[in-house]
C-alpha cells in the first residue's frame, strides 16, 4: 500500500492548499466590497473635476495655462498603476502589455518615454524589461491616500513644467463590473477637451475668475491631475481584489477537481491491493 499512502498524502496536501485558497477568496471578497465603496465614493469628485477641466480646455481664457497648450510630442510620460501583490490572474500582465504596445509605437516615431510606476509589480516589471523609471511608489495598502501620491505625481508635473515632457498619461485597470476589468490609458496633459456634446459649441466658453485666474488655475489644474491619478489607484485596487477573488475561486474549484481525481486513483489502488491480498490468501490455502 506504499502507492496508496503516497496518494493519501497528496490528497491531504491538496486539501490544505484548498483551505488556503478558500480563505483568500473570502478575504478578497470582503476587501472587494470595501474597495468598491471607496471607488464609488471618489468617482463623482473625479468625474466632476474632469468635466470642469474639459470646459476650461474649451474656454476662451484670459490666462492660458501651459497645461492647456498642445505641443509637439518629443518626450511622453506614463504614470503606470499596478498592484503590490500577485495572485490576481492576468490583471497586471494585461496592463503591461497594453502600455508596452503604446510605448513601442512612440519609440518607432523617435519619441522618448519616462515612467512613474505605482505598485511593486510595475516596479519589478519595468526594472526587468527596461524603461526609464523616474519615480516609483509602492506599499500603499488597501486604503491609499492622496497625500501618498503627491510626490510621484509631482515628479512628472515638474518634468512637464520644465518642458521635459510633452504628454502625460495615466495607465490603470478600469472597473467595469465584477467579471470585467479592462486596462486603460488616459491622457492627463495637455488637458483633453470635454467630449460632452452639450459642450461642443461654436463659441468658446468664457469665465470670470475671482480674484485672479492664474493662482486659481494653477491650483485647480494640479489638483485635477492628482485627483485623476488617485481615482486610478482606487479603481485599480477594486479591480485587484475582484481579480484575486476570481483567481482564488478558480484555484479552490481546481483543487476540488484534483482531490476527486486523486480519490478515484486512491480507491483503485486500494481495491487492487485488497484484490492482490485475497489472491495471495486463496493461493496459499490452495497450496495447503
Swiss-Prot record:
GO terms for molecular function: ATP binding; proton-transporting ATP synthase activity, rotational mechanism. Keywords: ATP synthesis, Cell inner membrane, Cell membrane, CF(1), Hydrogen ion transport, Ion transport, Membrane, Transport. The keyword NADP does not apply. InterPro entries: ATP_synth_F1_ATPase_gsu, ATP_synth_F1_gsu, ATP_synth_F1_gsu_CS. It is found in: Cell inner membrane. Its main location: membrane. It is a peripheral membrane protein. One of its GO terms (biological process) is proton motive force-driven plasma membrane ATP synthesis. One of its GO terms (cellular component) is plasma membrane. Disulfide bonds: none annotated. The keyword Cell inner membrane applies. It comes from the Bacteria. Produces ATP from ADP in the presence of a proton gradient across the membrane. The gamma chain is believed to be important in regulating ATPase activity and the flow of protons through the CF(0) complex. NCBIfam families: ATPsyn_F1gamma, PRK05621.1-1. Belongs to the ATPase gamma chain family. HAMAP family: ATP_synth_gamma_bact. F-type ATPases have 2 components, CF(1) - the catalytic core - and CF(0) - the membrane proton channel. CF(1) has five subunits: alpha(3), beta(3), gamma(1), delta(1), epsilon(1). CF(0) has three main subunits: a, b and c. This is ATP synthase gamma chain. The gene is atpG.
Amino acid at each position: 500500500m506504499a502507492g496508496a499512502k503516497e496518494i493519501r498524502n497528496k490528497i491531504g496536501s491538496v486539501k490544505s492548499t484548498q483551505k488556503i485558497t478558500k480563505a483568500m477568496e473570502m478575504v478578497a471578497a470582503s476587501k472587494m466590497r470595501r474597495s468598491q465603496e471607496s471607488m464609488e465614493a471618489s468617482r463623482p469628485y473625479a468625474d466632476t473635476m474632469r468635466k470642469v477641466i474639459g470646459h476650461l480646455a474649451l474656454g476662451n481664457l484670459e490666462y492660458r495655462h501651459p497645461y492647456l497648450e498642445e505641443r509637439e510630442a518629443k518626450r511622453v510620460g506614463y504614470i503606470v498603476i499596478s498592484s503590490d501583490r500577485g495572485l490576481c490572474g492576468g490583471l497586471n500582465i494585461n496592463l503591461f502589455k497594453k502600455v508596452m504596445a503604446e510605448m513601442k509605437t512612440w519609440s518607432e516615431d523617435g519619441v522618448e518615454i519616462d515612467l512613474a510606476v505605482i505598485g511593486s509589480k510595475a516596479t519589478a516589471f519595468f526594472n526587468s524589461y527596461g524603461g526609464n523609471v523616474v519615480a516609483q511608489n509602492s506599499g500603499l495598502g488597501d486604503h491609499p491616500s492622496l497625500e501618498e501620491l503627491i510626490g510621484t505625481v509631482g515628479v512628472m508635473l515638474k518634468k512637464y513644467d520644465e518642458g521635459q515632457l510633452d504628454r502625460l498619461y495615466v495607465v490603470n485597470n478600469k472597473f467595469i463590473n465584477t467579471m470585467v476589468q479592462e486596462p486603460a490609458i488616459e491622457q492627463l496633459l495637455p488637458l483633453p477637451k470635454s467630449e460632452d456634446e452639450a459642450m461642443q459649441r461654436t463659441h468658446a466658453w468664457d469665465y470670470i475668475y475671482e480674484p485672479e485666474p492664474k493662482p486659481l488655475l494653477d491650483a485647480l489644474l494640479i489638483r485635477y491631475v492628482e485627483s485623476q491619478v488617485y481615482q486610478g489607484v482606487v479603481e485599480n485596487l477594486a479591480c485587484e481584489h475582484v481579480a484575486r477573488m476570481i483567481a482564488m475561486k478558480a484555484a479552490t474549484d481546481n483543487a476540488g477537481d484534483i482531490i476527486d481525481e486523486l480519490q478515484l486513483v486512491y480507491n483503485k489502488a486500494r481495491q487492487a491491493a485488497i484484490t492482490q491480498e485475497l489472491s495471495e490468501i486463496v493461493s496459499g490455502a490452495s497450496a495447503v
